[in-house]
Amino acid sequence: MELKNMELKRKLTINEINFIVDFIQPRPYIPPDIENAIIFKKKKGIIDQLVTIEIYESLIPKLKEEIEKQYVNSLIDPGECVGIIGAQSMGEYSTQATLNTFHVAGVDTGSSTGVSRFQDLINASKTVKIDNISLFFKPLFVKKNITELRKLVASKLIEVKLSHLMITSVIVKTEEISQYRQEIESCIELYNDEHFNYEDYEFCLKITLSRELLLKHRLHPSVIKNKLEEYNNDCKYAFLPISSQQILFFIFIYVNTDECIEKIIQDLMDKKICGVDGIIRYDFKRKDLFDDEWYIETTGGSFSNINCLADIFDLTKTKTTSIWDLYNTFGIEATKQFLIQELKTVMDGVDICHIKLLVERMTYSGTIEPITRYTMRNDESPLSRASFEESFETFLKAAKFKEIEPFTGVSASVIGGKKTEVGTYMCDILIDMEKLNLGDLKTIEDDDEYDYEDDGDLVYVE
């Protein structure tokens, strides 16, 4: 096709885009609400690409013709076994990815792609090998440098317990800490709402706190005292000033039996002082080398616990690598989209249709079902289960419980010598028995609406 003189490339208008995709029409035999959703997704994939291109106006009809041709070629034949095609496509990838791992030197770098990630996704592992959450700052903090950001999140992310902050701990009698009498009384007067006489308590837990860890997490002993009082207000707490040579923290225990003392101490040691449950570390990262915007990648944690940091992080951009964390927080529909995106990232060369089919198989029951040897044995057909593995045990169980074979699956139909309901065998022919009994049924040869061409093909006569 020749271009007109002085014709320039330009963006497509809305009317032109609608003209190009108008060949995609709804099917009359599908419920309208379902079919409209399918048509919308089909058109959206093409429209999203059309809005970005520039083209000569005279080539628009040619573009439409080519898109329609490619669209028709991409349609699967009715009755095709799409499951085995998708399994072959993904099996080829996993085989090649496994071979590629033998050519990578060094140790695991924490990558969220490759064979291990693929296994985590299809097995729906509750304990993934790489459990990360990516946190993005709100616009107010985006332009801050990394030093300011470190100060901002110093005591807010990593889960810190009392046992993490101490160097040593020992149970002593209260009379043995008399040399700290003045400092303890000053602390009680300054940091306690109600005055108490610490000498009324027989035993005391003396803890030496790590100055380095207190500075790292930006904690003051008074913060520790307030947190412990929330958990156990029956014990009393005091500490030496941070300017002391040793930062000592005292817990005055109101019981005098060894078992009770040990239980109280163990409970207090496991109490969280600051941070988010489950987060054991975090790292600052950038999207690329030349990007000034920082984000945080944590190890551990969950979506539900991150919500307490909504004043710092933009929770709409938060990402996780845990399937079950996402499912428990946002539900099955969000999990479906997550699985599609993750599998597309891992298997970049596999068609998206195969991935969507796999995800539908994993989530159609309303929860997440892994694709493993155990879930594949949940078929209602005894022959289909027996064709997978443990044939003898499967037949014994089927006979014991009087299971019925419906012969609806492909494997069972092949074993039983029955025509499988795939391809052209998906359709059944219905006969009008009344007309048959009356002899009114016409053959195709007798029907005036059909005729044969010279090459023998049957055609419809309008």
From Swiss-Prot:
Its EC number is 2.7.7.6. GO terms for cellular component: DNA-directed RNA polymerase complex. Keywords: DNA-directed RNA polymerase, Nucleotidyltransferase, Transcription, Transferase. InterPro entries: DNA-dir_RpoC_beta_prime (IPR045867), RNA_pol_Rpb1_5 (IPR007081). It catalyses: RNA(n) + a ribonucleoside 5'-triphosphate = RNA(n+1) + diphosphate. The keyword Transferase applies. Signal peptide: none annotated. Pfam families: RNA_pol_Rpb1_5. One of its GO terms (molecular function) is DNA-directed RNA polymerase activity. Belongs to the RNA polymerase beta' chain family. Component of the DNA-dependent RNA polymerase that catalyzes the transcription in the cytoplasm of viral DNA into RNA using the four ribonucleoside triphosphates as substrates. PANTHER family: DNA-DIRECTED RNA POLYMERASE, DNA-DIRECTED RNA POLYMERASE III SUBUNIT RPC1. This is Probable DNA-directed RNA polymerase subunit 343L. It comes from Invertebrate iridescent virus 6 (IIV-6).
